[in-house]
Amino acid sequence: MSAVPDVLGPPRAFHLLAKPTGAVCNLDCSYCFFLSKEMLYPGSRFRMAEDLLEAYVRQLIEAHAGAPEVAVAWQGGEPTLMGLDFFRRSVELVDEYLQPGQRAAYTIQTNATLLDDEWASFFKEHDFLVGISIDGPRDLHDAYRVNKGGKGSFDQVMGGLSFLRSAGVDWNALTTVHAANGDRGREVYRFLRDECDARFIQFIPTGGCDPTGPT
């Protein structure tokens, strides 16, 4: 009996986002659809366990058998709350399980508030593409992107971004379009282009916040 014909063609890579902290985040952005989800996770410090991390990496790479590239993508919540050692271990596991001829493409989406020289050096060493959540100049960014105490996060984000730029890390901007910045698109774009030197920008509209303006 002949084997089942290969009607799907050669193996293809796919993109899967992992959220190692679940919905847990150090910011309290009022438009975030994930804010109410944090209470659904067990305990007060939900974290992906190392045995689960290894199983995830192994299965992700096994599912890419024959594909030349494996996308390893991290999101949150805020994934950097896991700490740098978690991501060092994830890279070790990827290197362990990659098949001959395969390469890994690393991406992470972060609010940048916890980044420093050590994070930047790690991202550079392993060719991470880092997505930074930033909503424009200070007044527009801080309208919704605040910490748990209600204080704007702009200075922390710009500080984190400066570490990435100094290290030559490849990054892009993810900008949420909301009531505060929706009619100031040119200003936001020029800020990201000229002040942040962003080469790739995503604009994502949101709902769920007061359409008359920030509170």
Protein language model regions, located:
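Short structured motifs
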Residues: 3, 17, 157-158
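Short, motif-level signal for alpha-helix interfacial/capping segments enriched in acidic residues
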Residues: 3-6, 52-56, 62
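Canonical Radical SAM [4Fe-4S] cluster-binding loop centered on the CxxxCxxC motif
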Residues: 11-51
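A short, flexible beta-alpha/helix-coil linker loop
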Residues: 36-41, 139, 208-211
